[in-house]
């Protein structure tokens, strides 16, 4: 029942994730953050099997931080981070116990000054998109994003569109997902909006 949404706009990337951690029909926690800060300009939002998501997220977070330490505080770019995550999932799918994790990777490339949003699924498929979703958000919000997304949108426009998507999910989903955390990745780093 995870909800993961992302929108890339002109100056940043916005990500929304549901707060509810569920098991079957039970809500176990209503403050679950389904994102991990990989470095100062890369944020990973994830959905999937409960144990797999946390273990995979911690593994990716630790390895990107290890890279930064080894390379004299040089951080991986969003493109390099997406390639690393994709490779780990593609390698995992060929093992006896693959990770059942889907990822949205939001980033801001400080060298080019451009935001990015990468959609990566548990099979290791990766594509850079202007907007993306995993979980039930994909079923309910893709048409809304298709209709209202415009090239050249700014932060406020993107936030309004994300709120429209969340309102649509609240209206149409039969389960209460306890609201969403909204985070933004821009030239200044990663911030919690709501």
Curated annotation (Swiss-Prot):
Location (main, coarse): cytoplasm
Family (UniProt): Belongs to the peptidase T1B family.
Organism this protein belongs to: Meyerozyma guilliermondii (strain ATCC 6260 / CBS 566 / DSM 6381 / JCM 1539 / NBRC 10279 / NRRL Y-324)
A UniProt-annotated Pfam family: Proteasome
Keyword DNA damage: no
One BP term from GO: proteasome-mediated ubiquitin-dependent protein catabolic process
GO cellular component, one term: cytoplasm
Protein name (record): Probable proteasome subunit beta type-4
InterPro entries for the chain: Ntn_hydrolases_N (IPR029055), Proteasome_beta2 (IPR035206), Proteasome_bsu_CS (IPR016050), Proteasome_sua/b (IPR001353), Proteasome_suB-type (IPR023333)
Quaternary assembly: The 26S proteasome consists of a 20S proteasome core and two 19S regulatory subunits. The 20S proteasome core is composed of 28 subunits that are arranged in four stacked rings, resulting in a barrel-shaped structure. The two end rings are each formed by seven alpha subunits, and the two central rings are each formed by seven beta subunits. The catalytic chamber with the active sites is on the inside of the barrel.
Xref: SUPFAM superfamilies: N-terminal nucleophile aminohydrolases (Ntn hydrolases)
């Amino acid at each position: 029942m995870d909800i993961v949404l992302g929108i890339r706009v002109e100056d940043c990337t916005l990500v929304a994730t549901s707060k509810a951690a569920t098991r079957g029909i039970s809500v176990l926690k209503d403050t679950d953050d389904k994102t991990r800060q990989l470095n100062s300009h890369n944020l990973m939002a994830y959905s999937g099997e409960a144990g797999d998501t946390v273990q995979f997220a911690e593994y990716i977070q630790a390895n990107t931080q290890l890279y930064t330490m080894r390379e004299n505080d040089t951080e991986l770019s969003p493109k390099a981070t997406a390639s690393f995550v994709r490779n780990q999932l593609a390698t995992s799918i060929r093992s006896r116990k693959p990770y059942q994790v889907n990822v949205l990777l939001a980033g801001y490339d400080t060298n080019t000054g451009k935001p990015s949003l990468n959609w990566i699924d548990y099979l290791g498929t990766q594509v850079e998109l202007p907007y993306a979703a995993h979980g039930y958000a994909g079923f309910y919000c893709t048409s809304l994003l298709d209709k209202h997304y415009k090239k050249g949108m700014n932060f406020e426009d993107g936030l309004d569109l994300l709120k429209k998507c969340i309102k649509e999910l609240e209206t149409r989903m039969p389960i209460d997902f306890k609201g969403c955390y909204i985070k933004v990745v821009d030239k200044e780093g990663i911030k919690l909006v709501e």
